[in-house]
Design a protein with these regions (language model features):
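Residue-level recognition of tetratricopeptide repeat
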Residues: 19, 48-54, 86, 119-125, ...
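Structural motif corresponding to the intra-repeat A-B loop/turn of tetratricopeptide repeats
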Residues: 31-34, 65, 100-102, 119, ...
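Structural register within alpha-helical repeat arrays
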Residues: 19, 26, 58, 93-98, ...
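Inter-helical turn/loop elements of alpha-helical hairpins
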Residues: 18-21, 26-42, 46-50, 55-106, ...
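Internal alpha-solenoid helical repeat scaffolds
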Residues: 75-193, 200
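Helix-coil-helix junctions within alpha-helical repeat/solenoid scaffolds
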Residues: 241-465
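Canonical positions in the second alpha-helix
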Residues: 43-44, 77-80, 114-115, 148-149, ...
């Protein structure tokens, strides 16, 4: 075929432009490294307006934030599809399905499986498929995808971070640590591998080790996207918080490494707000929000801006809480109504999945207002946040909703139920001081002698990590 070049993976692309291929390859690197210059893909269609791969990748990049600009690129890709290489046609099919209105997630995943079967070195398509699986709450599919291409990518560092995260989400922490360490050996600057290892250390209550590791790695994070930069620091702050470091230390990380990101001219505010509000909810549940002064109110004022609504469910659920908690009740109600409308506009199959997310948002709205008993009415009797992956959140991000659930039970005088929920969590992570404090409170409310031992355990753990 005339005018063929090959991309980073060695796959054929119909173009005569070296600069177009260079922009595509730069985009690949930015995606896999969580760089902040993913917009480089917009250069590729300028360098060759007839290149299908350039147009469809640029359309995908713009699809979530600026769909009106994405449409002409999608149409350009369609119009030149007949002349494209087989690789480009398969990528086009997968992305076209992914960005279509009311897409069928299952079909989109299947198309990516097909793509990766024929073109297994395409790690950006693997990443794209894994992100889709994450928002579907299907880590099992994510693992199958990466395992399908692992054998031909064993020398690629990025593959191991992607493998590790899938394993983490399936609770296979030992396997995840092994995979992440392999990736770290190949490339010690891969931020997604840092992230995976921090997940492992955090889950295993190795809080000090996690903080030391991440702070050492942080010198390589300046070029990360707003999300990845602040998310890695969110993990650091969370380790300080869970390890019972002084609340002022958590506040310092919030100020210097999360909120400060907004000062950068190329920051993506919504990505920062997700990590900021997620951390402040954790602090709030622990009764430490006073140490943060007016930071929650400042954040909530930013979140009244509807430009940050309906970007993703996880953020919306947290925003509902932040608004209701700071007195912006009418705004929170407006966001809730928008979520209900959003659900009504998707396929019946997706409506069933997202109903659970809607109930969680309703519960967080009531919790923010201090209506604990009302909030509990929206959640199952045997609530477990692990069953809410559909909002697009990791196990660590979901954990806070278990803490909220237990807190609401205690605030409603339901100590026996709280004890059952806490004991279930302690079987997984018995080194968490806050859970022992909650257990102590639950036992005290039930007038049980076990409160003394729970308090001693909490005190010992509070002194174990950072004191």
């Amino acid at each position: 075929m005339e005018g063929l070049k090959v991309d980073k993976w060695g796959y054929e692309v119909k173009t005569n432009s070296d600069s177009c291929i260079s922009s595509i390859n730069s985009y690949y690197h930015q995606v896999l490294s969580y760089g902040r210059e993913r917009s480089v893909i917009l250069e590729a269609p300028k360098q060759d307006p007839n290149c299908v791969l350039a147009n469809i990748l640029a359309a995908h990049y713009l699809s979530s934030a600026d769909s009106s600009r994405a449409m002409p690129l999608l149409e350009a890709a369609k119009s030149y599809l007949e002349q494209a290489s087989l690789y480009e046609k398969v990528v086009f099919d997968a992305i076209n399905c992914l960005i279509s209105p009311n897409r069928d997630d299952d079909v989109a995943v299947e198309l990516h499986f097909k793509l990766l079967k024929d073109f297994p070195r395409d790690l950006v398509s693997l990443k794209r498929a894994q992100v889709l699986c994450f928002y579907m709450g299907c880590p099992d599919l994510s693992l199958k995808l990466v395992e399908q291409v692992l054998s031909v990518n064993k020398q690629e560092s990025y593959i191991y971070g992607m493998l590790a995260f899938s394993l983490l989400e399936l609770g296979r922490y030992t396997d995840a640590e092994e995979a992440a360490n392999k990736g770290f050996e190949i490339d010690s600057e891969d931020a997604w591998t840092h992230h995976a290892l921090c997940h492992v250390y955090q889950y295993k209550c190795r809080f000090k080790e996690a903080v030391q590791f991440m702070e050492k790695c942080s010198r390589t994070w300046s070029s990360l996207s707003s999300f990845m930069y602040t998310h890695n620091w969110w993990h650091v702050a969370l380790c300080y918080l869970e390890g019972h470091s002084p609340m002022e230390k958590v506040r310092d990380v919030y100020d210097q490494n999360i909120w400060k990101e907004l000062e950068r001219s190329d920051a993506s505010p919504a990505e920062v707000y997700l990590n900021a509000v997620g951390l402040l909810l954790r602090v709030y549940v622990r009764g430490g929000i006073n140490v943060f002064g007016d930071r929650l109110k400042i954040l909530a004022d930013c979140l009244t801006n509807k430009a940050f609504w309906h970007l993703e469910w996880h953020l919306d659920v947290l925003v509902v809480w932040a608004l209701s908690c700071t007195g912006e009740v009418s705004k929170a109600e407006e966001l809730l109504e928008g979520l209900k409308s959003r659900i009504s506009n998707v396929t019946k199959k997706k409506q069933q999945h997202m109903q659970r997310a809607m109930l969680l948002a309703e519960a967080l709205f009531e919790y923010g207002k201090g209506e604990n008993e009302r909030a509990l009415e929206f959640l199952d009797e045997t609530f477990d946040a692990i069953n809410y992956k559909i909002i697009g959140a990791s196990d660590e991000q979901l954990d806070v909703f278990n803490e909220v659930w237990i807190t609401m039970l205690l605030n409603s005088g339901q100590a026996t139920k709280a004890i059952q929920a806490i004991e279930k969590l302690l079987k997984k992570r018995e080194g968490t001081p806050f859970l022992w404090r909650l257990l102590e409170k639950s036992y005290s409310m039930s007038r049980k002698q076990e409160a003394i031992d729970a308090g001693k355990k909490a005190q010992a753990l509070e002194a174990a990590y950072f004191n």
